[in-house]
């Protein structure tokens, strides 16, 4: 910061003045007999070099020395300083994982800072969903085993979606090799347990990631999946009483991709995840005591996440998992995702 804010001429003047002041200070100590060297052949000496001066100065923010600031504040200060004092000779700026030690709000400040036009080529290495999405998915380059890949030909609306969306799953999705996409909290809460019941292993043990997205966002993720032939993605979705319109026709453009599958119940009467669960396990669930409500299916539809949590607890603590029937469309999706 010091070197970026001082001219060469003034820098020389500062160095000269620092040497004079150092010598005068040492002379004063001896004159006032505050420093007694007792006739030793060695005498105390100040290091009046520029490095010594630079080591002795610091910066202050709101009255607090930067040495006492948190690591997050130091990251912001470092990036801000780098951006504010780019010289004409600088052509490339490299920033490695600037998100380290940052709170959510400071990460937002960082994203706004990085979005500014610097006039130079900026490379940012990151594992942050927010940085990757807010700076534009079309600007991303993925490094994997020495190979570089880029998302080409994305719809402009898809780019804007990830820049503005509150959902921060972009890197989780793009870096995963086998992805199960589900609609909401209820499906997300139960899907890992269903996977474990089918494969006797947790998803992460088989390199599978489960990501919850808004059902209206599936196509945004599938557009990215279509760019990666080595990434398997299965969507588990409701038919909402119209399998042909809401599933078959809606996702017909992705049928050509061998790495993409959309799975839903074919029966229009089984319009939601909760109804499929209930119809496959009516007697078991009615006798489970999961709720005092006499209308269990109605409760499942009203309190989706709460019911999912209660069911998960029963599946993990009781023996009902051996009797529990996972709907076929979910079972098929979970089996498909690990096939080579």
List the predicted regions and their residue ranges.
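Extended helical coiled-coil dimerization/tether regions that scaffold
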Residues: 1-69, 74, 81-89
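Short N-terminal helix-initiation segments at or just after the protein's N-terminus
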Residues: 3-4, 36-39, 67, 85, ...
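Generic amphipathic alpha-helical segments used as scaffolds and interaction surfaces in large
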Residues: 9-20, 101, 122, 212, ...
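Catalytic cores of large soluble enzymes that bind and process phosphate-bearing ligands
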Residues: 14-17, 21, 71, 99-102, ...
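Generic solvent-exposed, charged/amphipathic alpha-helical segments
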Residues: 26-31, 111, 192-196
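Residue-level recognition of the N-termini of beta-strands and the immediately preceding loop/turn
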Residues: 40-42, 91, 204-208
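Switch/communication elements of ASCE P-loop NTPase nucleotide-binding domains
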Residues: 53-171, 188-192, 335-339
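Acidic, divalent-metal-binding catalytic cores of TOPRIM
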Residues: 132, 137, 141-340
